[in-house]
């Protein structure tokens, strides 16, 4: 070979898809947005279910945290076709955006994102349009309640079976809980707990039947609170303080070792692999931009 002769250039794009997937599967998902801009082929492979399957075989799966956010000025933009007033449910790899609204139009539609490929599909719509509904999941079913003004004892809650892909209304536990459109719900102790803001009562669903819950009202069901269950311990955030519920003593106990959270802005608790994630808003007065930490 002459000294002036150039060696043939071989790039990763010359490889077969299976080999490229094997390489991409070893790269952290935090780098996927940048890699997807390299070429259309990378973009397609990074959004494929085959990539997730390859990562699973290689033992390279990662936990990812998703935050519903309306701003378009973010690095990784995965926007729901519904608005931020939709209820969010997670069942397996799927993230469901339920209801919501566009301006004054309340929606009954349900959109499902496959977190493995970040692709959206439409699911069967609810029977009643709902905005800001309370959503809870249990045993592959999604419980949706409240979120509209024309509720009655027959339509206050509906349940979506993710296996049969069907909706059905659930009978109200008692006339005592019915009233208003605002409810809080949480999956706790293997069942669904529901609290009515207007009536200030709590019920739980057990083996298809409702019963009054003996949970202390002090700390449960306050508007604006955020709830999170980790290893069957229920945590609540209210007035920017985090507490946990002691079912034996029926009292809420302050969580020690955590400094007070900022007073100006919402706080959100979430389960991240049996660890609690705390999100709060930070307001910067200089340019009036809202930041999430």
Swiss-Prot record:
Q: Where are the Kelch repeats?
A: 94-140, 141-187, 226-272
User: Which is one Pfam family of this protein?
Assistant: F-box
Keyword field:
Kelch repeat, Repeat
Q: Which domain of life is it from?
A: Eukaryota
* Residue stretches making up the F-box domain: 9-55
Among SMART domains, the record links this protein to: Kelch
Q: What is this protein called?
A: Putative F-box/kelch-repeat protein At4g34170
């Amino acid at each position: 070979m002459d000294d002036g002769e150039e060696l043939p250039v071989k790039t990763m794009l010359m490889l077969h898809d299976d080999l490229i997937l094997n390489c991409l599967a070893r790269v952290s998902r935090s780098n996927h947005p940048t890699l997807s801009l390299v070429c259309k082929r990378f973009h397609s492979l990074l959004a494929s279910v085959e990539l997730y399957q390859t990562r699973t075989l290689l033992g390279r799966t990662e936990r990812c945290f998703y935050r519903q956010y309306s701003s378009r000025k973010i690095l990784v933009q995965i926007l729901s076709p519904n608005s931020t007033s939709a209820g969010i449910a997670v069942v397996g790899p799927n993230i469901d955006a339920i209801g919501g609204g566009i301006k004054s139009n309340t929606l009954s539609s349900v959109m499902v994102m496959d977190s493995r490929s970040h692709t959206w599909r439409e699911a069967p719509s609810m029977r009643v349009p709902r905005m800001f509904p309370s959503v809870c999941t249990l045993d592959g079913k999604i419980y949706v309640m409240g979120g509209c003004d024309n509720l009655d004892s027959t339509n206050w809650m509906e349940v979506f079976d993710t296996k049969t892909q069907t909706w059905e209304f659930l009978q109200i536990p008692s006339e005592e809980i019915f009233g208003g459109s605002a409810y809080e719900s949480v999956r706790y102790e293997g069942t669904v707990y529901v609290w009515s803001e207007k009536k200030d009562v709590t019920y739980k669903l057990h083996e298809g039947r409702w019963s009054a819950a003996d949970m202390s009202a002090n700390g449960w069901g306050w508007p604006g609170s955020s709830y999170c269950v980790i290893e069957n311990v229920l945590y609540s955030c209210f007035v920017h303080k985090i507490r946990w519920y002691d079912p034996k003593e029926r009292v809420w106990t302050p969580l020690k070792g955590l400094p007070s959270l900022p007073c100006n802005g919402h706080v959100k608790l979430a389960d991240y692999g049996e660890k609690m994630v705390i999100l709060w808003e930070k307001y910067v007065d200089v340019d009036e931009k809202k930041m999430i930490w």
